[in-house]
């Protein structure tokens, strides 16, 4: 997958807040290295995995999984409460889907308010934008929703997340079976990849820079 033609992977938040839709799915022939574009105009194509003759793709900015075959993309799982990232096959069938952060009402509101969003991007440093993050809680300058305030030294795990950690086990049909969380009061956020090895599941939490074993 190619998440964005307009922004580098380090500037993913610029692509989100700029309402980017230049992602692609590309097939590369292992014999001669020739590349073939299977789909374009995707809103940040992050992960891809074969599924029943199609390719299952996570489209992060549209919060969904789609199946891409010879025809038009077909929705498989929509209206996710998170920003999906990579997909990998799971032992026994199905898939592991990682999510690098969760959606919030505040960010959804900013994405709809075009004039405010453009002014924010122009006048405020990117690290202080009202936008999702791979990690949070490191600066008092971070934007917050009211319920995200620390009270008596405690941050509620169900508070609106600025960063989050999640991996979901999907069935062979791409439907959720169960999930594992690092909630708002956790630190293993920004989960961008998963891999099974032996009897363990390994996760890459990019927020704290950790490789996790479950």
Residue ranges of each PLM-predicted region?
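Sequence-structural signature of mature extracellular/luminal beta-sheet repeat domains
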Residues: 1-214
